[in-house]
Amino acid sequence: MKVTALGNTLTGFGQALATTLGVDTTSSSPNCAEMMVVFARGTSEPGNVGLFSGPTFFDALEVMMGAGAVSVQGVEYGASIEGFLQGGDPAGSAAMAGIVEGTVQNCPNAKIVMSGYSQGGQLVHNAAAMLPAATMAKISSLVIFGDPNDGKPIANADPSKVMVVCHPGHNICDGRDLVLVEHLTYSRDAVEAATFAAARAKA
């Protein structure tokens, strides 16, 4: 119960900060585009794409791919501390897998990016393991910021399509559960990550 209360407090703080900064923490774009990003936010982040890495990543992709070329669908899931401690929310993992499968079926010509931050990275790992190899072969790139599973391969994914961004000394990337300042600075890696995803899309 205390863990849940803490998570709710952090989510409220994150949404207040996002509002102050004018950052949109929710994205639902089912329409097909040249690039389709399926993104899972981190634990206790607001909205469905969060604040600390997703929005800046999407903005950088839009610059590189062109106006209107990028569509983003955030994964709706609890993003609770309990889910993180489970290795990634099971329902959220299944939801992400379902969104990716549906996107592959409905937008066969799109360049699909699976991405997540922190617990969202766990969802990327879990969803990839749930999806058939034929579906994963159609994924253009996979980008994870602050991966709790850092160093573990993503199931059914070509390693050349994978980019994992982890800062030195980042407690979460080291397999622990203490959130320090390194965990909150992944927006600075947006351009590097977007450059990778855009290059993969154009390969």
UniProtKB/Swiss-Prot annotation:
Disruption phenotype: Abolishes penetration of the host cuticle. Abolishes conidiomata formation on the host. The 2 disulfide bonds play a critical role in holding the catalytic residues in juxta-position; reduction of the disulfide bridges results in the complete inactivation of the enzyme. Keywords: Disulfide bond, Hydrolase, Secreted, Serine esterase, Signal, Virulence. InterPro entries: AB_hydrolase_fold (IPR029058), Cutinase/axe (IPR000675), CUTINASE_1 (IPR043580), Cutinase_monf (IPR011150). The active site is at S118, H170, H183. SUPFAM superfamilies: alpha/beta-Hydrolases. Its EC number is 3.1.1.74. One of its GO terms (cellular component) is extracellular region. Pfam families: Cutinase (PF01083). The keyword Secreted applies. Its main location: secreted. One of its GO terms (biological process) is carbohydrate catabolic process. It catalyses: cutin + H2O = cutin monomers. The record marks Q119 as: Transition state stabilizer. PROSITE patterns: CUTINASE_1. Induction: By contact with cutin. Residues 1-18 form the signal peptide. It is found in: Secreted. One of its GO terms (molecular function) is cutinase activity. Gene3D superfamilies: alpha/beta hydrolase (3.40.50.1820). Disulfide bonds join C32-C107, C166-C173. PANTHER family: CUTINASE, CUTINASE 2-RELATED. Belongs to the cutinase family. Catalyzes the hydrolysis of complex carboxylic polyesters found in the cell wall of plants. Degrades cutin, a macromolecule that forms the structure of the plant cuticle. Allows pathogenic fungi to penetrate through the cuticular barrier into the host plant during the initial stage of fungal infection. This is Cutinase pbc1. The gene is pbc1.
